[in-house]
Structure formats: C-alpha cells, structure tokens
C-alpha cells in the first residue's frame, strides 16, 4: 500500500464515504426499470458503468471511439460521428451518459437527439463535472496537450489508462443543463451536486491535503453545493 493510498483509506473509508460512483449507479437503478432498453452514450470499452447497466436491462453502447466494440457488457456497439444517432425515434426506455457531456461540442443537438430516441416517459440519467470547480476550470483553461500530460498522473492512473478526450464544458452548470432539458422538450431535471474524494490529489500528499480541505468546505453546507464537482441529473421525456 502506498502512502497516498493510505491517506485515502484513512480519510475516505468506503464504509463511511460513498464517493460519486455509488450515488450515480443508485440514480440509474432508481429511475430505470428492469428489462429496459438502455442506450449508453459514450460507452467506451468495458467499464463499471456498462457492467452496472447490463444488470438492469439490455444495453446498446454508442461512441465516437471504435474501442466501444471491445465493451463486453453491451448487446450492441455502435460507432458514430458524434452528431445524429443512428436509431429510430422512441427506440429506448433510458439513456445514460457517464462523464460524457463535458466532451460534447454541440450540447443542444445532443439533448434533442436524446429526446428523439427516448420513448415517451423514458428517462435520461447523467453524471458530468460542474464547470465551477477547480478541476473543470483547470481542464478548460489549459491546452489539451497539458491535460494529456497531467490528468492521469494527478489521479495516479497507470500508463495503460485511456488518455483524456478533448473537453468543451458547454453544458456543465446547473442552469445550462436545466435550459438544455427545456429546449429539448424534456421534463424539469432533478439535479444533485456531490463532492467526492479528491482523486486528483493522488500525485502528492500536499495536493491531497489541499484538495481535502476544499472537499470538507464545500460539503459542510448546502450554501457551497454550487462549488461541488459532480453533477447528477435525471430527466424524463413527457409521457403522451
């Protein structure tokens, strides 16, 4: 066990701290009925989100990265150009995107496509970073070359980890997400803000303690929830 991992185990034990992934998967389970037809947008290669969704229903994955074809949890994998999805109207009971919206260059097109492929009464569940957070601000301000250099290193990921994709952050505030849902004809979204463990503090104990202080502050009061990094959202397509 490394010193850095020891810090996470000491201050963020799994028995007392859920992080951001557990609440997101719970959101999906609470809103997606068993045996649903699920579209995972930005599915990528095999991952925990796809595995979780496959335990709920039949999952079709779509991504601009051909590596989606290597995702063993998908019943179907589709590579597309990132604009219009190659599915008929009302094809799915649920759509899910996990840390995808920050990479979407044209968010209103994305939300309208989600609304189109959802059946009436269907749900869209997503997780994405909040723009008003030091991680998102850094990713937005730094050139992508620096993001490639630093992002995985700061999170303590190995060389085998996938390089981060380019980011746009054009939909990553609560107000913008609410507006996009309305413009696409979706219901008023239910949004939750979370600040999980400081994963970008794995590179050095000094970073860890600094980011932990930030986590303790923004989780101390609802007043600071707009400064938390993780946005969880669920919205439905109105039933006919």
Q: For each predicted feature, which ranges?
A:
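Conserved N-terminal segment of class I S-adenosyl-L-methionine
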Residues: 1-84, 94-96, 111, 227-231, ...
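Helix-to-beta-strand junctions that scaffold the AdoMet/dcAdoMet cofactor pocket
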Residues: 33, 104-105, 118-120
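Short glycine-centered segments of the SAM/dcSAM-binding site in methyltransferase folds
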Residues: 37, 121-123
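Short, solvent-exposed loop/turn segments at secondary-structure junctions
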Residues: 44-47, 65-67, 101, 131-133, ...
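Acidic/polar helix N-cap motif
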Residues: 81-84, 88-89, 106
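A short SAM/SAH-binding and catalytic strip from SAM-dependent methyltransferases
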Residues: 94-106
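S-adenosyl-L-methionine-dependent methyltransferase catalytic module, highlighting the catalytic core
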Residues: 108-113, 123-236
